[in-house]
């Protein structure tokens, strides 16, 4: 079970450390203090994950069982790579038999078994390059993509929802039948057209906010399970609704 860490880490460093004022702005100091005292950050370091985001995926999987049996996975917005680390492990991906393809416009250090493309997913060539890198239809498409925040909540929501929509259409284009799609979104409502499209193509569509997401964060995840296949009839039963779970 993925339990929230408490107290101190196994290295003996206690939570609640302060950063000396020095020349740092108050906002920067608060961010650093929050980061170094975050139990998920400390746990990620101890368990060898590149970011605390690993526990978001593990927690979602613990409840919704999306990773077991996956043979190929595509990871969008992959840097720094914690989701790709998990994907490589569950698919038994190796450099000689890569089963994970990842993409980000940011640099990412190599991960064994992960074919990484440093490019913008919105580049017209990106989808085809990902399909070539994975060597077959993926069982899962993951997207942790988010547009750089502006501080204006509605603007940030619209920009990130655009990335979510592009990722969703890509997932429908490439997923193996029975596959799953998981994408970051922001609180503020998922676009009706996107939800309708996902419900038409997947057996179940839900919103998820894992405990490892910071309490003050507006991020949520949109999970679509059980891809019906590209030949699914429009007369199929609609998917279960996108309630928060």
Swiss-Prot record:
Q: Which EC numbers characterise this protein's activity in its record?
A: 2.1.1.166
Tell me yes or no: is Transferase among this UniProt entry's keywords: yes
> Reaction(s) catalyzed by this protein?
uridine(2552) in 23S rRNA + S-adenosyl-L-methionine = 2'-O-methyluridine(2552) in 23S rRNA + S-adenosyl-L-homocysteine + H(+)
Active site, UniProt feature: 184
Region (Disordered) spans which residues?
1-26
Record's InterPro entries?
A: RNA_methyltr_RlmE, RNA_MeTrfase_FtsJ_dom, rRNA-MeTfrase_E, SAM-dependent_MTases_sf
SUPFAM superfamilies, A to Z: S-adenosyl-L-methionine-dependent methyltransferases (SSF53335)
Q: What class of enzyme is it?
A: transferase
Organism superkingdom: Bacteria
Q: What does this protein do?
A: Specifically methylates the uridine in position 2552 of 23S rRNA at the 2'-O position of the ribose in the fully assembled 50S ribosomal subunit.
Name of the protein in question:
Ribosomal RNA large subunit methyltransferase E
Gene encoding this polypeptide?
Answer: rlmE
């Amino acid at each position: 079970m993925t339990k929230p860490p408490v107290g101190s880490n196994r290295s003996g460093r206690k939570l609640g450390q302060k950063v000396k004022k020095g020349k740092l702005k108050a906002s920067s100091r608060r961010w650093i203090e929050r980061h170094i005292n975050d139990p998920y950050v400390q746990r990620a370091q101890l368990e060898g994950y590149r970011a605390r985001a690993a526990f978001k995926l593990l927690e979602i999987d613990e409840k919704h069982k999306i990773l077991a049996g996956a043979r190929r996975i595509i990871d969008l917005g992959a840097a720094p790579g914690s989701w790709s680390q998990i994907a490589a492990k569950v698919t038994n991906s190796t450099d000689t038999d890569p089963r994970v393809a990842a993409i980000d416009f940011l640099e990412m250090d190599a991960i064994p078994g992960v074919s990484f493309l440093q490019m913008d997913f919105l580049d017209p060539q990106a989808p085809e390059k990902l399909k070539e890198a994975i060597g077959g239809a993926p069982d899962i498409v993951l997207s942790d993509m988010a547009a750089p925040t502006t501080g204006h909540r509605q603007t940030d929501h619209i920009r990130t929802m655009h990335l979510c929509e592009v990722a969703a259409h890509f997932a429908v284009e490439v997923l193996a039948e029975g596959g799953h799609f998981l994408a970051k979104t922001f609180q503020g409502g998922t676009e009706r057209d996107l939800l309708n499209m996902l419900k038409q193509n997947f057996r179940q569509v839900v919103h998820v906010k894992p405990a490892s997401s910071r309490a003050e964060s507006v991020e949520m995840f949109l999970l679509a399970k059980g891809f019906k296949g590209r030949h699914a009839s429009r007369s199929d039963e609609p998917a279960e609704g996108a309630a928060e779970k």
